[in-house]
């Protein structure tokens, strides 16, 4: 089992808030575009409520921080397009390899 280093854990905690903020900004932009459509107000309201309920479950919005889950969390953030693989370039090579294995099923 892969052990997350203290420096990777610290870096993850420093980065996650910014990544989530950027992702939520993209969501808000999508909501604004959607709300600007010509659909009926009731249709927009209920569709928006459905979108928000779904989006709240995305790790780009809500994530429980556990040191042991960092490789899996990074993979989930990549798979849900919250971040790109390049965004984890500051992390250790070992962690990048672990995430690469989870996301792509192979080592670098």
Question: Where are these predicted regions, by residue range?
Answer:
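Acidic, Ser/Pro/Thr-rich low-complexity regulatory regions
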Residues: 1-108
């Amino acid at each position: 089992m892969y052990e997350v280093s203290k420096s990777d854990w610290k870096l993850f905690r420093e980065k996650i808030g910014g990544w989530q903020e950027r992702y939520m900004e993209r969501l808000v932009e999508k909501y604004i575009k959607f709300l600007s459509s010509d659909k009926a107000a009731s249709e927009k309201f209920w569709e928006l409520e459905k979108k928000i309920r779904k989006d709240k479950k995305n790790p780009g919005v809500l994530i429980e921080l556990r040191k042991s889950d960092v490789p899996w969390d990074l993979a989930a953030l990549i798979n849900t397009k919250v971040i790109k693989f390049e965004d984890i370039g500051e992390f250790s090579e070992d962690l990048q390899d672990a995430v690469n294995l989870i996301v792509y099923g192979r080592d670098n």
